[in-house]
Structure formats: structure tokens, C-alpha cells
Amino acid sequence: MEQYWGYHTMLDCRACDIESIKNHDNIYNFAKSLVNAIDMKAFGEPQIVHFGEGNKAGFTLVQLIETSNICAHFCNDTGDAYIDVFSCKPYDRDVVRDEIIKFFKPRQITVNYIERQA
């Protein structure tokens, strides 16, 4: 099997539980739990900041990991979430999906996955 430089999972999560995506502590706990669940090493604390206006407003999460990053944006109005996991260390995409379901309860998840190699 060819070894790739990186693995990138992009999850578009429709109609999450609104209260869960507007809750700073829930997003923080998600970041901590996901890092552990996919056996990564966090580099510092997650950065979670509320950004945007109108239908773009919501929390943005950035969690640096030793092998790259976990990023997410949560939309207050729709309950949608856009979550990316990028790492040069392989991880289980199903575990990522399970963690999202546990913390945000989306009605639907569309998963796109690419293996990165320059």
C-alpha cells in the first residue's frame, strides 16, 4: 500500500442540535474528546471564537495537533457545521463521524475524504 503524506476528512453536518453548536464548552469538550478518540496529540488548547454576521455567524474551532489540525465552523442560524480533520498520521474516519454525532447530533453528514500527496 502506498503511503500518503496526509489524510484529509471534510464533514458537512446538516441540522445539528442548535444548542450544542452554540455552546462554547460543548465545542471545547468535542475537540478534547476527538483528539483522544483518534489517537492524536494536541498542541496547545483549542481556539474557539465566535465570528461572523447574519447567517454566517457562529463559533470557529481550531485545534492544532502534532501532525496538523482539526478545524470547524458552526452556523448559528441553520445548525450546520463544517468540520475538517487533516493529519499526516492515519486515523479512523468512522471514529471522527461518531464523535460528531455524539456531540452535535446532526440529521445528516456528508463525508469527503482525500489522501494528500504533492
Where does each model-flagged region fall?
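Polybasic/polar functional segments that serve as interface/processing modules
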Residues: 1-118
